[in-house]
Every structure is written in structure tokens, then in C-alpha cells.
């Protein structure tokens, strides 16, 4: 019984020093392989939605150059189009586990 009374305060101190699980993943910048690893962690067996497309595959290279130069198709006074992808959300900005779950299958 004496050993038990010595271990209780030690275990209590260890419990206080351990990081809280809720704070283990705070909103973070996640880029490249770190972003992919976080998606694997969050999505698990469900997998995640990933279809890489370079801008040149979607539209011709001249269109992108004209938009950057302010030529036809640049959007007029509206400004640049808003990007809503996971890279813009989690790498350029910060995202949470709940936001990452939106990209799971």
C-alpha cells in the first residue's frame, strides 16, 4: 500500500504535464507532404479527394498570361478570381482538422 501512495502524486504530475489531446493539432499551415500526411491521418480508410491539374491543362498558357497582364479575360474591375482549393486554404492560410475532413471521400 505504501508504494501506491508514492505513485499517485507522480502519476498526477505526469497527467498535468501531458499535452491535452484537443490542443495537439491546432490550426496549422500544412504544405506539400505534410498536407498529404494530415489528410491520410484525418481521412483514414475513406481516402481523400485529389485530382491534380496544372493550370495549363485547364486553359491555354496565353490565357493565363493575358489575365496576369490585365488583358482580355482578366475579369475587368472584379480583381483576381478567388481560389478555394485545399492548398490555398491550408498552405497559404491555416486550417483545422474539421476543414481537412471536408476533403475526405
From Swiss-Prot:
Q: Which CDD domains match?
A: IlGF_insulin_like
One record GO biological process: cellular response to palmitoleic acid
Q: Name one GO molecular function term.
A: insulin-like growth factor receptor binding
Q: Which Pfam families match?
A: Insulin
Q: Any S-S bridges, and between which cysteines? A: 31-91, 43-104, 90-95
Its annotated compartments are: Secreted
Which PANTHER family does this one have?
Answer: INSULIN, INSULIN/INSULIN GROWTH FACTOR
User: This protein is called what?
Assistant: Insulin
The organism named in the record is: Ovis aries
Amino acid at each position: 500500500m505504501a508504494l501506491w501512495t508514492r505513485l499517485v502524486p507522480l502519476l498526477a504530475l505526469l497527467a498535468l504535464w501531458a499535452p491535452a489531446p484537443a490542443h495537439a493539432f491546432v490550426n496549422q499551415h500544412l504544405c506539400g507532404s505534410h498536407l498529404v500526411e494530415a489528410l491520410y491521418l484525418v481521412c483514414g480508410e475513406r481516402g481523400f479527394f485529389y485530382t491534380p491539374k496544372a493550370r495549363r491543362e485547364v486553359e491555354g498558357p496565353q490565357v493565363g498570361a493575358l489575365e496576369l497582364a490585365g488583358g482580355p479575360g482578366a475579369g475587368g474591375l472584379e480583381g483576381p478570381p478567388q481560389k478555394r482549393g485545399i492548398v490555398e486554404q491550408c498552405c497559404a492560410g491555416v486550417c483545422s482538422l474539421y476543414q481537412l475532413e471536408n476533403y475526405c471521400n
